[in-house]
């Protein structure tokens, strides 16, 4: 059924910019969850909308980057109990080319330890980052200690899905779900004018045919390692 199909495709989905404009609202989060997603991860626009603050502090299955300041609403790790195994999902934000934030390399070790101490046999990281080198380095840093790490933020799917030497599934960026003929989801003409003139421009979402992008990681439940990866684009 639809629920089983969604679970096969993904246990988590990045909900960044699901609200009109950017950020996320409680109603857009509920819409994503109603589609069958088990958990929503976020990124650098997590706190853009104040309406989401109480929702982030609730028990709803939504997390924001774990390396946000401790005063920020929400949490950065979630344990999903599927019955047959526990899956930990960790959300991190990169420090290169984005707003100042605690170094993700300084917090990930304790997060992995926390996931394992709570019985998670599978650990997945959503690394919301701009710099490809930072994403790649993080992949190698956690290789063998987590099941899979996927990058988000650039809205552009990369073609480097792979299994790292110690069994961790990796992709630099899973892409976006949104209008195919667009500039990262934004209407083409305003984006061109902004880049051409350098003048303030009001961006609007593009309409038209949409694409769903992502990456499927096949993970062995016993070893917690990725055995196969496949790009998704529909």
Task: For each feature predicted by the language model, list its residue ranges.
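Single conserved hydrophobic/aromatic residue that forms the stacking wall/gate
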Residues: 1-9
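Active-site beta-strand/loop signature of hydrolases that rely on acidic residues for catalysis
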Residues: 10-19, 40-43, 124-127
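Conserved beta-sheet core of the metallophosphoesterase superfamily
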Residues: 13-14, 30-42, 54-64, 132-202
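Extended active-site neighborhood of metal-dependent phosphoesterases/phosphodiesterases
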Residues: 33, 39, 44-89
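Divalent metal-coordination and catalytic microenvironments
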Residues: 40, 90, 124, 153, ...
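Binuclear metal-dependent phosphoesterase catalytic core
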Residues: 67-68, 73-89, 161-234
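Binuclear metal-dependent hydrolase catalytic cores centered on His/Asp/Glu-rich metal-binding motifs
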Residues: 73-122
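Conserved, well-structured core segments that form or line functional sites
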Residues: 109-113, 120-132, 139, 143, ...
């Amino acid at each position: 059924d639809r629920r089983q199909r969604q679970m096969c495709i993904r246990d988590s989905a990045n909900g960044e910019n699901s609200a009109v404009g950017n950020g996320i609202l409680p109603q857009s989060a509920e819409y994503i969850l109603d589609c069958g997603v088990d958990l929503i991860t976020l990124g650098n626009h997590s706190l853009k909308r104040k309406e989401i603050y109480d929702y982030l502090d609730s028990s709803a299955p939504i997390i924001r980057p774990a390396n946000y300041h401790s005063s920020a609403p929400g949490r950065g790790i979630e344990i999903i109990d599927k019955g047959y195994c526990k899956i930990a999902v960790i959300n991190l934000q990169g420090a290169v080319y984005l707003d100042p934030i605690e170094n993700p390399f300084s917090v990930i070790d304790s997060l992995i330890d926390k996931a394992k101490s709570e019985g998670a046999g599978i650990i997945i990281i959503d690394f919301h980052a701009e710099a490809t080198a930072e994403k790649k380095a993080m992949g190698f840093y956690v290789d063998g200690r987590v099941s899979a790490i996927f990058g988000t933020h650039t809205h552009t799917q990369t073609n480097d899905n792979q299994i790292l030497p110690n069994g961790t599934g990796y992709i630099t960026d899973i892409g976006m779900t949104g209008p195919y003929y667009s500039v990262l989801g934004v209407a083409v003409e305003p984006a061109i004018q902004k880049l051409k003139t350098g003048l303030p421009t009001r961006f609007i979402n593009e309409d038209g045919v949409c694409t769903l992008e992502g990456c499927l990681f096949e993970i062995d439940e016993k070893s917690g390692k990725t055995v196969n990866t496949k790009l998704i684009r529909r």
